[in-house]
């Protein structure tokens, strides 16, 4: 009888929560969310460590693991994010002793702990009692199809809007956070793990979408107009007429669904952040680990408003593919979310991948160089995933610092060397502030909308093959060009109020935008800013409807041209006369707009008997600034040359652009107020470079460095020069 009453009370609580969630589903995520003003984020040195899962170990070795971490020099671990079934092995029965002993052991060794809320992998009893929690995943085909029902056995298989799931998650979070609130070893909380929408299309998700549309558009008639639903006679007369996402053909519907999916993720993490703050200590920070950046269904910038500090999991190429570019892209974006420092919660320890088909252990020196790469972009913490390789299951070959034998190895020796250096120079590296004069405008709406109407697909007409190039590849290309040119960059967003902090704004394929954003870009140019913009910009409005005006719509005056036609390119074309002197890189592909200059100057023309009458690249002086427009998709080499030309005109080039190709440099100001200059050699060959800044000290060896001195960089090595006299004893032990 008591168990029945307990179960009945639980069901009543869930029913009450369901009513509350249904009401809340009608509201969008809050416009703003405040991060804690009390969390202690004044790190005195770099946090360096690993994820640790004692529960995975084949035998009892906690003391040995902690001793090895301490000997290696680690000062932080991240734990607990995958362990709901251990915290709560049965409904309502909580156990803490298994984690208490691990936290206590870390504390005695002076190793700090970040605990994760273990909500991304549900226990078996929950799936059994509430099968409705499992996701019904979106099944998008040309002619629609029912959602695909998830089953138990994989992580991230739940509907995070489910009232039952929210009930159990809240109960668990409150228990765990309150338990460790006053534990001095626990310094922060990670919300969930690599959260996304999981493509959930459950009934409650769809009902929430209906309520969201009703609030946003007001009436079905307004929605019909915005989405152009008279097409194919698909207009609706009541909100109940709205079709489910699976079969919807409307580009407006598809775009709005992606926004709704993003808002669901934001709401979920804001909800968790509020719960954690209610029960935690003000000294404990709140973060979440983004599973990389620039996702289609995660609004990273909105989520960041609820965090004390963002965190990101960054994986990258190794061996001959280790060049720092992946870290640069991910971490420029992460730093831009709050214009602040960030944490790296996961990065390569040894090999990665879910199979044994992609096993490339880093060369000697690459693990060490990788740590400093993260720090040079503003990371205050670097943690490996993970401490010890797992003996079975999905991530058997995603190796940790220790291999499956759990013994010291080459990776352990290299991270120990790195930790020894960080113990000496960490206070000089933490809290690095980076000032960029170039920004890239990132539009998640354009990413998604171009995905619905791709400009470069494999196969022929009606094949609907995968894209061979898209918005993401274009953004990556343009960022990579800046990286290769040793230009630091930030990311800005469609919500950015103005762009005046930057001398050069790069706008890749801004396919979706409202008129207000177009005006802000035009005003930026008029007031002296420089813009490099690409094809498809200004074409469609915020509802993914093409504007009823000559392209590029509101940008026409600032761009100085218009166009009425465009064409796919079946094969790459050259530009007449190789105007940017790039030799075999003088190629464009995929897409060509027939630009008709009105005030703009033609910079380059297609070398083609028909298309050759229209320029491929134009530049327009508008007010005090310029707008350079690429009407086609440039080759990588050509893109780099075009951006270099724009940087020169904006006065943003100097000695950094004269460095050898394998050498990359990063600059910033540390918490001591001194300028730092990181020089990286991403190659297996020794390189000599000329140091171009004020005299200082190489923090890694303590030796003075004069202006114009030659720096010798060994293979996969670096130098870190701090300007002026150093304040700590830095000579190597």
Describe the residue ranges of each PLM region.
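Bacterial N-terminal signal peptides
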Residues: 10-19
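N-terminal carbohydrate-binding accessory modules
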Residues: 26-78, 89, 104-108, 112, ...
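The substrate-binding groove and active-site-proximal loops of carbohydrate-active enzymes
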Residues: 48-57, 82-97, 151-170, 192-199, ...
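Conserved, mostly hydrophobic/aromatic
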Residues: 50, 69, 77, 106, ...
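Short, acidic/polar
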Residues: 56-71, 171, 175, 292-303, ...
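Aromatic-lined substrate-binding rim segments of carbohydrate-active enzymes
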Residues: 63-72, 76-143, 174-177, 272-280, ...
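Polysaccharide-binding and catalytic clefts of secreted carbohydrate-active enzymes
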Residues: 136-309, 313-326
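Carbohydrate-binding surfaces of carbohydrate-active enzymes
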Residues: 239-242, 270, 282, 315-733
């Amino acid at each position: 009888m008591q168990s029945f009453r307990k179960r009945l009370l639980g069901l009543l609580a869930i029913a009450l929560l369901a009513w509350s969630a249904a009401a809340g589903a009608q509201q969008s995520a809050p416009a703003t969310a405040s991060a804690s003003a009390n969390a202690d984020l004044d790190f005195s040195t770099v946090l360096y460590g690993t994820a640790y899962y004692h529960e995975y170990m084949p035998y009892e070795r906690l003391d040995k693991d902690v001793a090895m971490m301490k000997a290696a020099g680690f000062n932080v671990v991240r734990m607990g994010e995958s362990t709901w079934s251990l915290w709560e092995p049965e409904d309502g029965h909580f156990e803490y002793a298994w984690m208490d002993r691990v936290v206590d052991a870390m504390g005695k060794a002076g190793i700090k702990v970040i605990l994760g809320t273990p909500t991304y992998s549900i226990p078996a009893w929950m799936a059994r009692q509430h099968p409705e929690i499992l996701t019904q995943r979106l099944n998008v085909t040309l002619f629609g199809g029912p959602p695909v029902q998830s089953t138990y056995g994989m992580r991230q298989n739940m509907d995070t809007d489910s009232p039952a799931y929210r009930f159990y998650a809240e109960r668990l979070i409150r228990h765990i956070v309150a338990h460790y609130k006053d534990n001095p070893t626990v310094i922060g909380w990670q919300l969930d793990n690599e959260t996304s929408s999981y493509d959930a299309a459950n009934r409650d998700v769809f009902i929430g979408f209906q309520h969201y549309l009703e609030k946003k558009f007001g009436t079905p008639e307004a929605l019909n107009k915005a989405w152009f639903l008279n097409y194919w006679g698909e207009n609706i007369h009541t909100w109940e007429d709205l079709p489910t996402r699976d079969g919807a053909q409307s580009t407006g519907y598809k775009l709005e669904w992606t926004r709704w999916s993003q808002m669901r993720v934001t709401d979920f993490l804001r909800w968790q952040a509020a719960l954690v703050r209610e029960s935690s200590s003000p000294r404990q920070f709140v973060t979440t680990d983004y599973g990389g950046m620039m996702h289609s269904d995660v609004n990273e910038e909105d989520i960041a408003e609820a965090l004390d500090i963002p965190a990101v999991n960054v994986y990258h190429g190794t061996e001959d593919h280790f060049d720092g570019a992946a870290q640069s892209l991910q971490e420029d974006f992460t730093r831009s979310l709050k214009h602040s420092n960030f944490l790296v919660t996961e990065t390569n320890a040894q090999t990665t991948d879910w199979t044994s088909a992609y096993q490339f252990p880093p060369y000697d020196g690459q693990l060490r160089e990788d740590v400093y790469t993260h720090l040079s972009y503003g990371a205050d913490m670097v943690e490996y995933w993970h401490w010890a390789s797992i003996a079975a299951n999905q991530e058997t070959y995603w190796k940790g610092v220790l291999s499956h034998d759990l013994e010291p190895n080459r990776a352990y020796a290299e991270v120990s060397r790195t930790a020894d250096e960080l113990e000496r120079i960490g206070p000089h590296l933490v809290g690095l502030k980076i000032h960029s004069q170039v920004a890239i405008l990132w539009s998640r709406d354009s990413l998604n909308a171009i995905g619905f109407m791709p400009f470069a697909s494999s196969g022929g007409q009606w094949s609907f093959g995968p894209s061979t190039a898209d918005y993401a590849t274009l953004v990556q290309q343009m960022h990579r060009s800046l990286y290769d040119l040793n230009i630091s960059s930030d990311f800005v967003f469609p919500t950015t109020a103005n762009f005046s902090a930057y001398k050069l704004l790069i706008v890749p394929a801004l396919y979706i935008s409202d008129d207000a954003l177009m005006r802000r870009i035009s005003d930026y140019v008029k007031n002296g800013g420089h813009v490099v913009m690409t094809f498809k910009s200004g074409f469609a409005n915020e509802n993914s409807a093409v504007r009823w005006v000559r392209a590029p719509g509101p940008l026409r005056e600032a761009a100085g041209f218009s166009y009425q036609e465009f064409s796919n390119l079946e094969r790459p074309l050259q530009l007449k006369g190789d105007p940017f002197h790039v030799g075999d890189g003088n190629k464009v592909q995929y897409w060509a707009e027939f630009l008709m200059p009105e005030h703009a100057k033609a910079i380059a023309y297609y070398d083609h008997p028909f298309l050759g009458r229209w320029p491929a690249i134009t530049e327009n002086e508008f007010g005090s600034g310029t707008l350079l427009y690429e009407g086609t998709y440039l080759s990588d080499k050509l893109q780099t040359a075009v951006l270099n030309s724009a940087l020169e005109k904006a006065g943003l080039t100097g000695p950094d652009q004269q460095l050898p190709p394998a050498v990359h440099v990063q600059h910033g100001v540390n918490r001591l107020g001194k300028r730092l200059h990181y020089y990286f050699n991403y190659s297996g060959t020794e390189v000599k470079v000329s140091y171009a800044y004020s005299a200082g000290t190489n923090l890694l060896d303590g030796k003075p460095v004069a202006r114009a001195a030659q720096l010798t960089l060994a293979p996969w090595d670096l130098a870190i020069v701090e300007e002026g006299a150093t304040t700590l004893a830095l000579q190597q032990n």
